Each structure stands twice: as structure tokens, then as C-alpha cells.
């Protein structure tokens, strides 16, 4: 067996671990999203007081997803989880327009963090099942996502409740990790 075939085999092993940081304001749907990814019951979800970790298999990767609470008093502790992050997933409640400015400020601060420099970002425009939800394009414009030049990014409409759009977002995550590791 040649070196190339050994490398190919290593590349296709399902145990490539990916560290994903799942952040966003409280009540954005982070935990619901995580439970949806893990195919768990989403009927009884309470605010996350610390963090949840789940491992999910996807496209030959073991995605270790760290879901950190989004309450204002918890946000200063987010930086304790930045180390070795492969992908940042930022969840936004698309129906809570009153908090768009606050969520934009938090995202901007995250993008300025040195330990997250160059880390791909997926923004989930969540709660698209609600009639009052802003479309992903409007959110992208409001957050000035088009000005991000130091990393790859994607905005994905989704509903963590129904699961719609969630897999599309995770497919992008896996593609980004693959591209980064080549």
C-alpha cells in the first residue's frame, strides 16, 4: 500500500473530529438546533445555564458541538470556549427584530476575537417557520455580512423546530472544514 492510498484512507475515516462552537443570544434556538441535529426530543427545552456538548456524525466527520448559553450574564464566558474552534455557528432569532442590533454587536465582537481569526462562520437565520421572521437576505444586509473578508461565511435560513434548512447549513459546515483541511 502506497503513501497516497494510506493518506486517502486516513482522510476517509469517519473519526475526523471537528469542534463547533454554537453561539447566539438567549432564546435564539441554539439548544433546539443542537437537539434537532442529534435527532433528540425538542418538546421540553429550558434556557442553557452553562453549556451542552453533543457529538453528531455527518459526512465522515464527528462534529463535537458546544452549545453555550446566550444570556447576557453568560456571554463574557464565551471566550473560554474559543480555543481550537474549527467552525463558529451563530444562531439568530429571525423573528425578534428588536434584538437585531444587539445580536449584530455580539457577532461583530466574536469576529474580532483573535482566537476565532479565520474560523468559518455559519449564521443560522432561525425561526423561519414564524410569519414575523425576517428573510436571511435582510438579516445578512443588516449584519453587514458582505463586509467579512477574513474568513468564509454563509447565512442559512432555517427552523430548528421543523428541521428545515438545518441539514443544508451542516452540509456547508462539512464542506468548509474539508476545504480548510486540504
UniProtKB/Swiss-Prot annotation:
Q: Per the record, GO CC terms?
A: centrosome; cilium; cytoplasm; cytoplasmic microtubule; Golgi apparatus; Golgi membrane; microtubule cytoskeleton; midbody
Which biological process annotations from GO are given for this protein?
A: cilium assembly; mitotic cytokinesis; protein transport
Q: Where in the cell is it found?
A: Golgi apparatus membrane; Cytoplasm, Cytoskeleton, Spindle; Nucleus; Cytoplasm, Cytoskeleton, Microtubule organizing center, Centrosome
Binding-site residues for GTP, renumbered to this chain: 24-31, 67-71, 126-129
Matching InterPro entries: ARL2/3, P-loop_NTPase, Small_GTP-bd, Small_GTPase_ARF/SAR
**Which keywords does this chain's UniProt record carry?**
Cell cycle, Cell division, Cell projection, Cytoplasm, Cytoskeleton, Golgi apparatus, GTP-binding, Lipoprotein, Membrane, Myristate, Nucleotide-binding, Nucleus, Protein transport, Transport
* Lipid attachment site numbers (N-myristoyl glycine): 2
**UniProt GO molecular function:** GDP binding; GTP binding; GTPase activity; microtubule binding
Instruction: Name the membrane topology term.
Output: Peripheral membrane protein
Calcium recorded as keyword:
no
Q: Does the entry annotate any disulfide bonds, and if so which pairs?
A: none
Q: Name one Pfam family in it.
A: Arf
Principal place of residence: Golgi
**CDD domains listed in its UniProt record:** Arl3
Q: Which family does it belong to?
A: Belongs to the small GTPase superfamily. Arf family.
**What does the record give as the function of this protein?**
Small GTP-binding protein which cycles between an inactive GDP-bound and an active GTP-bound form, and the rate of cycling is regulated by guanine nucleotide exchange factors (GEF) and GTPase-activating proteins (GAP). Required for normal cytokinesis and cilia signaling. Required for targeting proteins to the ciliary membrane by releasing myristoylated protein from unc119 cargo adapters into the cilium.
Protein name (database record): ADP-ribosylation factor-like protein 3
What is the species of this protein? Danio rerio
Organism taxonomic ancestry: Eukaryota, Metazoa, Chordata, Craniata, Vertebrata
